[in-house]
From Swiss-Prot:
GO cellular component terms given for this protein: plasma membrane; proton-transporting ATP synthase complex
Protein name in the entry: ATP synthase protein I
Keyword Ion transport: yes
Function: A possible function for this protein is to guide the assembly of the membrane sector of the ATPase enzyme complex.
Principal localisation: membrane
Localisation per UniProt entry: Cell membrane
């Protein structure tokens, strides 16, 4: 279980660093409004990642399958963005997907750079 917590902390850290880099880049190249929309989506993605980690942690002990209530978080955010004129759907959605970029970075790092056999096991 210690390995799970270590992986979770690493994924959250990478997500936060990636969020900061992208937020500053979007602010420089676009506008503060779009950057804040991205940041809102990225923060929602971190909350989603935390909810997913809690579900995975309970898997096997208390539950037999993962819950699907996490998706309500994204749906509520997209509905809010579509109703409120200050929010833009695309930057929020792309911000939400930042945690997916973190997973890609982690998989590439483990598969190609690290000598760790975590993902190479059949």
């Amino acid at each position: 279980m210690q390995e799970f917590y270590q992986l979770y902390q690493e994924l959250v850290l990478i997500t936060l660093v990636l969020t900061g880099v992208v937020f500053i880049s979007v602010w420089i190249f676009y506008s503060l409004n779009i950057a804040l929309n991205y940041l809102l989506g990225a923060c929602t993605g971190v909350v989603y990642l935390r909810m997913l980690a809690k579900d995975v942690e309970r898997l096997g002990r208390e539950k037999q399958s993962l819950s699907k209530t996490r998706l309500a978080l994204l749906m509520a955010l997209i509905l809010l963005a579509s109703r409120w004129n200050q929010l833009q759907i695309m930057p929020i959605f792309l911000g939400f997907l930042t945690y997916k970029a973190t997973l890609i970075i982690y998989v590439v790092r483990v598969a190609f750079i690290s000598d760790s056999p975590k993902l190479r096991q059949p």
